[in-house]
Amino acid sequence: MKLRIIWLGKTRDPWIKQGVTEYSGRIERYLPLAIDELKDEKDATLEEGRRREGERLLKQLSPNAVLVALDERGQQLDSVKFAEFIGKHRDSGTTELVFAIGGSYGFSDEVRSRAGKVLALSAMTFTHQMVRPFLLEQIYRACTILNNEPYHH
């Protein structure tokens, strides 16, 4: 199974870039990983920005891709349940599992409809920039859980 992360907007902060690089490298020891940064909308109304970003995101998906949208209103899973979710897709023949992190406008209704699952990393709200290394760390943690390695206590 291939993992893919799609996010809107460039990663700006050096510490976020460092976290993305660190955890991407760790994940690639377990699963192939691709990260795509899509252009975000800067000068649009809320609805127009969501629509444009949503169209751009959906064009990136293959028909068989399983889309997981990260949203503060999504379902929360603990790390073990998140690992089980990834393992279920890995073991059931999912060819591509795509995690999408929206921009500051959030997701359009079309993206939400296409998503097989909507997840929240926390009940707290984080910037879409900060979610990037947090998601990658949780994916890495899931890989170690699935391989019975001691990273997760």
From Swiss-Prot:
Any one annotated GO CC term: cytoplasm
Superkingdom classification of source: Bacteria
Keyword S-adenosyl-L-methionine applies: yes
E.C. code: 2.1.1.177
SUPFAM superfamilies the record matches: alpha/beta knot (SSF75217)
Keyword tags: Cytoplasm, Methyltransferase, rRNA processing, S-adenosyl-L-methionine, Transferase
Main localization, broad class: cytoplasm
Residues that bind S-adenosyl-L-methionine: 70, 102, 121-126
Pfam families in the record: SPOUT_MTase (PF02590)
Listed InterPro entries: Alpha/beta_knot_MTases (IPR029028), RlmH-like (IPR003742), tRNA_m1G_MTases_N (IPR029026)
Family: Belongs to the RNA methyltransferase RlmH family.
Description of how the protein assembles with itself and partners: Homodimer.
Known function: Specifically methylates the pseudouridine at position 1915 (m3Psi1915) in 23S rRNA.
Protein name according to UniProt: Ribosomal RNA large subunit methyltransferase H
Gene name tied to this protein: rlmH
